[in-house]
Amino acid sequence: MVYRPTAHEFDDLPKIEFIDSCPYQVFLEQYLKPCVPVLIGPKLTAQWKANTTWITSKGDPNILHSYILPDKPCTSRDNTSGNSLLNDNDIKNFIRSYAERIVNNEDKNVFLDSLLLSPNYEYLEENYGTIPVPLAYCNEKDRYGSQRRETVPLKSALHELRDEQVQLQCRQAPSNQALKSLYAKDMHLFRHLDPADFPYSTPDIFADDWLNAYVIDCESDDFRFAYLGSHLTTTGLHTDVYASHSFSVNLCGVKCWLFIDPKDLQTIASLYDDQQLPSWITKDDLFRGPLVNHRHLIKILFQYPGQTVFVPSGWYHQVLNIGTTLSINHNWCNASCILQMYTALKEQYEVSAESLKDLLEDGIVTKDRFSQVVTEVVEANYGWCWRRFWGMIKHQLKRRDAILHSSEYFSKWPIQPEFLPPLSWEYSILKNILLNDEPGSTFDSGSPPSSIVTIFKSLGDFKE
């Protein structure tokens, strides 16, 4: 079925498909391979421990519940939400329309109860309070024009976020303009956790993850995050790191997403005076401004508690939090987006080399040193480099080889064979980057290292 929220003038924006449950083969063929976003129902993560420990209905009620009660005014005045995408009437219409379309009374009551859920501040502080986290002030800008951030212990962030939630609930602030609009983003709460203490398990449909398998096994790092934002906080229009995929599981609060298909990026950028994508798409953009005749290219999605969003590689998206929201997110990758990641990294090297070419032409550095400088700049600005990219590929090929031969290969990111795509398909993708160029002697160039090519060719005997 298709998820179709209605909120008057937003009705003509295309919607992201909703599916109640998603078997692996369905996900692989209909969404992962073609890189199509999808919203998945609560069954996918119903068994998560975080559903009972990270959130609660006994604490301060979430402000978004006021949008559903006819005898209760909304917290913010109409058109003062400060986010410039949805005013309070828009939000009210979306949420009430969704509730009205739930036929089963029991299901409707479950949904209404979910709007009361809030973060379990005491539990989060007790278990993760000393971990340093990035805290964004969404109403403030740094010198580069981005949201101002600082790193604080999670305990401090929780205290400030809870204060904001209480102020909104008590009607002490008419909008987020009077508050700090705090959003704790990219929180690494799981990096050093013992597996027995994990509050969730990665859904099987997302388990074929080369990125986390590599950085967890080889770098003691991860791309697993938690996000905690107050009412009307935002993440601007962007695409995910390294051209990876992501998924986001919403535990409490509501998220409004806008999506742009990669094939429509140039068209949309051309509609703006500077020929660039905006940092935030506004309601005026959609209905009176540059997008008024092209808003059919913008897809909208409301994500409610318990639901999971799959964001494919290359899809630009922005997010507005409604109520206090708490989510668990991964960046991840596999064969379905490895060509996009390869191309994106190659472009980073080309752009950096072009900007630094005077160093080479003026004889300031040697050719070998120039390559090192380019790599240093790419890694500093982009956070990724050929050495790590090829290391990830090699790690994945070794894991695949071990599965094929039923041999021992220890990994902190194990995967069951039934949640892997056909090797023949994976092989057909990888050969585009592993067999088209002459192998290199090191891991530091865009040419595939010969040691990786050797492993890859050996898998060719099994690909059928």
Swiss-Prot record:
SMART domains in UniProt: JmjC (SM00558)
Biological process per Gene Ontology, one example term: cytoplasmic translational termination
Every JmjC domain range: 182-349
GO CC, alphabetical: chromatin; cytoplasm; cytosol; nucleus
Gene Ontology MF terms in the entry: 2-oxoglutarate-dependent dioxygenase activity; peptidyl-lysine 4-dioxygenase activity; sequence-specific DNA binding
PANTHER family in alphabetical order: 2-OXOGLUTARATE AND IRON-DEPENDENT OXYGENASE JMJD4, ARGININE DEMETHYLASE AND LYSYL-HYDROXYLASE JMJD
The name this protein goes by in its record: JmjC domain-containing protein 1
